[in-house]
């Protein structure tokens, strides 16, 4: 006997504002049962001696020191820009003033 019924899926769809067909209700009810069975199996295997973790291996960020290096001259950079105003890039306005 399925634990997730068509009525359960229809209720979740309404709450989620999803329009599901009759075929989708049947298919998703079966799929959700399979998913819940898999979660139950994992839950039964994972004991209290297993720490919860988001990754199987520890993650370590590798940082490097900032290094100041020469860059292009301002004039050369602005020469490649499509529009310039007062030694700055000119871009289209996207926000209205109030």
Curated annotation (Swiss-Prot):
Keywords: ATP-binding, Ligase, Nucleotide-binding, Protein biosynthesis. It is an enzyme of class 6 (ligase). It catalyses: L-glutamyl-tRNA(Gln) + L-glutamine + ATP + H2O = L-glutaminyl-tRNA(Gln) + L-glutamate + ADP + phosphate + H(+); L-aspartyl-tRNA(Asn) + L-glutamine + ATP + H2O = L-asparaginyl-tRNA(Asn) + L-glutamate + ADP + phosphate + 2 H(+). Transmembrane segments: none annotated. The keyword Ligase applies. GO terms for biological process: glutaminyl-tRNAGln biosynthesis via transamidation; regulation of translational fidelity; translation. Gene3D superfamilies: Glu-tRNAGln amidotransferase C subunit, N-terminal domain. InterPro entries: Asp/Glu-ADT_sf_sub_c (IPR036113), GatC (IPR003837). Disulfide bonds: none annotated. Its EC number is 6.3.5.-. GO terms for molecular function: asparaginyl-tRNA synthase (glutamine-hydrolyzing) activity; ATP binding; glutaminyl-tRNA synthase (glutamine-hydrolyzing) activity. The keyword Protein biosynthesis applies. Heterotrimer of A, B and C subunits. Belongs to the GatC family. Allows the formation of correctly charged Asn-tRNA(Asn) or Gln-tRNA(Gln) through the transamidation of misacylated Asp-tRNA(Asn) or Glu-tRNA(Gln) in organisms which lack either or both of asparaginyl-tRNA or glutaminyl-tRNA synthetases. The reaction takes place in the presence of glutamine and ATP through an activated phospho-Asp-tRNA(Asn) or phospho-Glu-tRNA(Gln). This is Aspartyl/glutamyl-tRNA(Asn/Gln) amidotransferase subunit C. It comes from Acidothermus cellulolyticus (strain ATCC 43068 / DSM 8971 / 11B).
